Amino acid sequence: MSHQPLSCLTEKGDSSCETPGNGPSNMVHPNLDTFTPEELLQQMKELLVENHQLKEAMKLNNQAMKGRFEELSAWTEKQKEERQLFEIQSKEAKERLKALSHENERLKEELGKLKEKSERPFEDITGRCGFPRTDLEQEVEQLKRQVEQEVEHLKIQVRRLQAEKADLLGIVSELQLKLNSGGSSEDSFVEIRMTEGEAEGAMKEMRNSAGPTRTDSISMGKCTEDARTCVEFEELTVSQLLLCLREGNQKVERLEIALREAKERISDFEKKANGHSAIETQTEGSTQKEEEDKDPESVGIEVETLNVQVASLFKELQEAHTKLSEAELMKKRLQEKCQALERKNSATPSELNEKQELVYSNRKLELQVESMRSEIKMEQAKTEEEKSRLATLQATHDKLLQEHNKALRTIEELTKQQAEKVDKVQLQELSEKLELAEQALASKQLQMDEMKQTIAKQEEDLETMAVLRAQMEVYCSDFHAERAAREKIHEEKEQLALQLAILLKENNDFEDGGSRQSLMEMQCRHGARTSDSDQQAYLFQRGAEDMSWQHGQQPRSIPIHSCPKCGEVLPDIDTLQIHVMDCII
């Protein structure tokens, strides 16, 4: 904030403009002769302290305005979220309508098939009749869940309204405290104005030592403007509170409408549940009827609790309206006080510029608030459109449910008529199946007896096999021992045979050498020589006789490979092993 200087000093020390920079010219100033310089300094210090306090109050008001703006932005975000929830609910309702339409078409197709096949015997009617009943039960459960979800949603909205109401009541109480302290602030403003006049008179007398005091007088002028801005901010806060309370009233009205719609839906669902319970008592019995009667009772209790909450909300809203009227009265009083202050204080050009800036900023804020309101209205219109769509979807849903119920009734009637015809055929078929089952059981019992006998025989065979295996192990061990002993004997016999063969060869060689020497000696003695042919024949015959004699003198070979059990002689050890295994077994 800028102010005109209180005194324009010349080179000689005189003032070129004697008019003060703030305050009217016709205002009577007190005589400064009665005040001492110390008292003037004390008053200046007090004014500085008050100026500092006013600045802090302005900062707090600015922070409060920022908080209000943030709350408004958060509220708009909540509205957007609610709108998204409504859109999701509308989509779900559309999907349910599609599913119901598909089910209705399927039931119509089944009706057509039943009408076409009414002349023929049916075997699987009971299996088909179970599906629509289960579908009906599922739909009833889904509708009950929807009602419970809507009731919970309404409860959440009521809690939100209660919290908002508590916040608004706290804000109103704070404003009342500020307004109660407003009277003392006005008195302080008047005192500030009086001290400003006194300070200006003192400054005219003390021009040479007026360096630091000029800044103090300028700050005094700023205090009045700070007070005006404080009042304007308080007016803005009051107006914003009024808007918030009006919006709260609108929310309560919407909730009342939603509660009425929920009550209507609950009544419709109760009627439908009663209808379904009447149908199910004819088919299933009294147990399910008691379970279905409990659900509407619980829904009715929840509706009564909601009605009580709505009544309490109405009472709280009436109290809020009374507090709003009190706040409006306080606003009028503040406006009157502001007008009185404006009349007292004459505006300078610099103050006018500052006021214009403040007005411009206030208009900007108002435009922002209006834009927010327009957005909120648009969102409210969209939500209302979505509600209307939901209402139309619910109407179509009710129609489809009625058609579904009619189709189910016709199906049940047809199934009852055809069940009476099919009972006799089913009894005959069941009797035949029983006979076949008894025959199959008898044959299976015979097979079981035969299997038991075979199992007993196999167990006996297994026992004998175990004994035989033990005997085989004993025989095998004995056979391996005998085989090892025989192999040793055979090796010894082979060694002896080799030694005999060597000795026989040596003996033959020795005998041949001796016979030749004797022949040579005989030839030399006798000197008679026969012809070569006769001599050769004689020698040949004698050699043959010697060979036969040698063969006659050789020992006969004893049979080695013979069976120990039966005594049969075999040529090889392998054949002997095979024979022994067969002979023992």
UniProtKB/Swiss-Prot annotation:
Region (Interaction with Rab8): 58-220
Alphabetical keyword list: Autophagy, Coiled coil, Cytoplasm, Cytoplasmic vesicle, Endosome, Golgi apparatus, Metal-binding, Phosphoprotein, Zinc, Zinc-finger
Post-translational modification: Phosphorylated by TBK1, leading to restrict bacterial proliferation in case of infection.
Modification type Phosphoserine: residues: 188, 209, 346, 531
Short sequence motif LIR: positions: 187-192
Sequence motif: UBAN, positions: 478-483
InterPro entries the UniProt entry points to: CC2-LZ_dom, NEMO_N, NEMO_ZF, Optineurin/NFkB_EssMod
Keyword Iron listed: no
Pfam family, any one: NEMO
Zinc finger boundaries on the chain: CCHC NOA-type: 555-585
Coiled-coil blocks: 38-181, 244-512
Biased composition (Polar residues): 16-25
PANTHER family (alphabetical): NF-KAPPA-B ESSENTIAL MODULATOR, OPTINEURIN
Comment text on domains: The LIR (LC3-interacting region) motif mediates the interaction with ATG8 family proteins. Ubiquitin-binding motif (UBAN) is essential for its inhibitory function, subcellular localization and interaction with TBK1.
Record function comment: Plays an important role in the maintenance of the Golgi complex, in membrane trafficking, in exocytosis, through its interaction with myosin VI and Rab8. Links myosin VI to the Golgi complex and plays an important role in Golgi ribbon formation. Negatively regulates the induction of IFNB in response to RNA virus infection. Plays a neuroprotective role in the eye and optic nerve. Probably part of the TNF-alpha signaling pathway that can shift the equilibrium toward induction of cell death.
Assembly: Self-associates. Interacts with HD. Interacts with GTF3A. Interacts with MYO6. Interacts (via UBAN) with ubiquitinated TFRC. Interacts with GTP-bound Rab8 (RAB8A and/or RAB8B). Interacts with TBC1D17. Interacts with TBK1. Interacts with TRAF3. Binds to linear ubiquitin chains. Interacts with LC3 family members MAP1LC3A, MAP1LC3B, GABARAP, GABARAPL1 and GABARAPL2; OPTN phosphorylation increases the association (at least with MAP1LC3B). Interacts with RAB12; the interaction may be indirect.
Protein name: Optineurin
Gene: Optn
